[in-house]
Amino acid sequence: RHARDGSVCPGTVKVRSEERVLLDLDALDIDHVMPQAWTAHWPLSDGTSVTAEEAAAAAIKRFAPEGLDARSDAILLRQEAIPRMGNLTLVHYGVNRSLQNSAFAAKRKALFDHSNLHLNRQLMQLDTWDEQGIAARGEALADLALKIWPGPV
């Protein structure tokens, strides 16, 4: 079981109240909800845009003796959040390829249209996706994993 209520079992999706069908796991792909190439469609939480060049410069500033300014720090926090578990989900391969670096609104709509995985339900209810959302979802996924696989007792 990977849902607390038992509505979704590994390898199956509940289509109707009594009917289960096999889920084609080979058709799923791992998606970075906030994409690795985020600068084009994902402004910082203060609403300002970032260029790819500015993101690269922030990574270099990390090692400068004068340290980071607030903007560079925000850029680096975003860069560090992107590969985290809370930012990853499963989507149909074709959906992932068509959306790649799209804004959250487009990705959320695609989840509504093409996903019935319990894993994506919380994402479909959100209006925004940022570093705080990534951290919160990561903690929730870790808590769920510990309930499913509690380890040795």
Give the positions of each predicted feature.
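Aromatic-lined ligand-binding clefts that engage carbohydrates, nucleic acids, or primary amines
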Residues: 1-56, 74
